[in-house]
Amino acid sequence: MDNTTNCTLGTEQAVQLFKEYNLFVTAFLLFLTILLQYGYATRNKVIYILKMIVLWCFWPLNIAVGAISCIYPPNTGGLVAAIILTVFACLSFIGYWIQSFRLFKRCRSWWAFNPESNAVGSILLTNGQQCNFAIESVPMVLSPIIKNGVLYCEGQWLAKCEPDHLPKDIFVCTPDRRNIYRMVQRYTGDQSGNKKRFATFIYVKHSVDTGELESVATGGSSLYT
């Protein structure tokens, strides 16, 4: 006599399970939707930080689930697939940390551990502040602006400063190189003629090297430097 227990979930049981946990599922899906839709550094930085934490948790979760699949495979084919996927997840997770530490060594910014990108922009102001910001790729042109005495770049609030504080060169760092952008144009003043309230700067990609940014003490104006 076969004493093996059938663990297959029936339709009625599945429906009952969904009825019991549908509120949790709804809240979880709403949470993910809010993170994905509003989790941008240019919109809401609190939600963006939560999004980064969730993304950081996904790799260990994938590795853990993959390890469980290797221990309890459905069949031989499933075991092979589980091993391949788990190894891929482990290598990807290790690669992320290697690249992040290389980028951190180059730019000295916690933005280096941003799982969404592999680059960090950096503006070393002449008043001693270092303003770092998230950037998805290495562009050909950067256009920081000053509005009401506040510096913005790529839509992100960086620090309070004046037009004279902007340097000749700014940088975008990647794990293997430092991209240098040189100022080619500067526009100051608004309709009232106040040159400290509004300014636009145009920086064009000038050169590429393998140097590192000098460690500059920040004035604490930005939580993200």
Swiss-Prot record:
Q: Which UniProt keywords apply?
A: Glycoprotein, Host Golgi apparatus, Host membrane, Membrane, Transmembrane, Transmembrane helix, Viral envelope protein, Viral matrix protein, Virion
Instruction: Please give the Pfam families that the UniProt record associates with this protein.
Output: CoV_M
Q: How does it sit in the membrane?
A: Multi-pass membrane protein
Cite a GO CC annotation.
viral envelope
Domain of life, per lineage = Viruses
Task: Give the Virion surface membrane side ranges.
Answer: 1-20, 73-77
For this chain, the family text in UniProt reads: Belongs to the gammacoronaviruses M protein family.
The record's note on quaternary structure and interaction partners says: Homomultimer. Interacts with envelope E protein in the budding compartment of the host cell, which is located between endoplasmic reticulum and the Golgi complex. Forms a complex with HE and S proteins. Interacts with nucleocapsid N protein. This interaction probably participates in RNA packaging into the virus.
Which named protein is this? Membrane protein
